[in-house]
Amino acid sequence: MADAQFDSALDLLRRLNPRDTKKNLQAITSIVPDLTEDLLSSVDQPLEIRRCSKTKRDYLLCDYNRDGDSYRSPWSNEFDPPLDDGTVPSERVRKLEVAANEAFDVYRELYYEGGVGSVYFWDLDDGFAGVILLKKGVTPGAKSSGEWDSIHVFEATDRARMSHYKLTSTVILHLANETESLGEMDLSGNMTRQVEVDLPVESDASHVANVGRLVEDMELKMRNLLQEVYFGKAKDVVGELRSLASLSEASKERATQREMIMSMHR
């Protein structure tokens, strides 16, 4: 019964507007509380921002830095609200986490020119895993708004002087615009892609460089897919449904075309 409820919940969420994922998750879990943990760990939702009380720096919240009702800051390695026995990475993995946060902070400034980013690592039996989070919002105006959320989850398995990386990347995008001539447009959705690769590792620092290249390449591919395939298709559909010309002008144009066709058949 639980499996059927879980599958039905996922199927329902896939059919609803992605911008309302958080609200819809809360509604489903209030009806079936037993699904809460499974849904929170399985469903990607827009990232939330919180400020670290110790360092005064913003960080992003997700299921990977959550322990109960508390969230761990990547800058201070402390939980908010405070948690005495919260799960934190080992000393080695924490050093890698700090280095990765510094590296992706530069990446965020270069590629996003702002926004918020956070990196979280945790230990595995034969290596370690982590998540890279990036969020950029368009400053809401009277007529437009938008948000981009990137969630990159990876596993790194040690193999002698090589490491096997498995990366799962998700982009959650929301764009909205409203004009008097065209009305309201709301474009929301998400995309997930995966890649696995073996890369050489000389030291722990190599992991940060390897993961950085994987994320950079994946984001470039996903941006191109969004722009060329999804946005291109949406543009074609909107072009078929809407016209910049008024209805009267369109009617006159169709009437002229009919007259020309009829004259050609005389």
Curated annotation (Swiss-Prot):
UniProt keywords, alphabetically: Actin capping, Actin-binding, Cytoplasm, Cytoskeleton
GO-annotated biological processes: actin cortical patch organization; barbed-end actin filament capping; filamentous growth; mating projection actin fusion focus assembly; mitotic actomyosin contractile ring assembly; mitotic actomyosin contractile ring contraction
Subcellular location: Cytoplasm, Cytoskeleton, Actin patch; Cytoplasm, Cytoskeleton
UniProt keyword Cytoplasm present: yes
Pfam families: F_actin_cap_B (PF01115)
Stored PROSITE patterns: F_ACTIN_CAPPING_BETA (PS00231)
Matches recorded under Gene3D superfamilies: 1.20.58.570, F-actin capping protein, beta subunit
One annotated Gene Ontology cellular component of this protein: cellular bud tip
GO molecular function terms attached to this record: actin filament binding
Keyword Nucleotide-binding recorded: no
Chief location bin: cytoplasm
InterPro entries with a match to the protein in the record: CapZ_alpha/beta, CapZ_alpha/beta_2, CAPZB, CAPZB_N, F-actin_capping_bsu_CS
Superkingdom, natural source: Eukaryota
Task of the protein: F-actin-capping proteins bind in a Ca(2+)-independent manner to the fast growing ends of actin filaments (barbed end) thereby blocking the exchange of subunits at these ends. Unlike other capping proteins (such as gelsolin and severin), these proteins do not sever actin filaments.
Assembly, per entry: Component of the F-actin capping complex, composed of a heterodimer of an alpha and a beta subunit.
Family statement drawn from the similarity comment of this UniProt entry: Belongs to the F-actin-capping protein beta subunit family.
Protein's UniProt name: F-actin-capping protein subunit beta
Organism for this UniProt entry: Aspergillus oryzae (strain ATCC 42149 / RIB 40)
Encoding gene (name): cap2
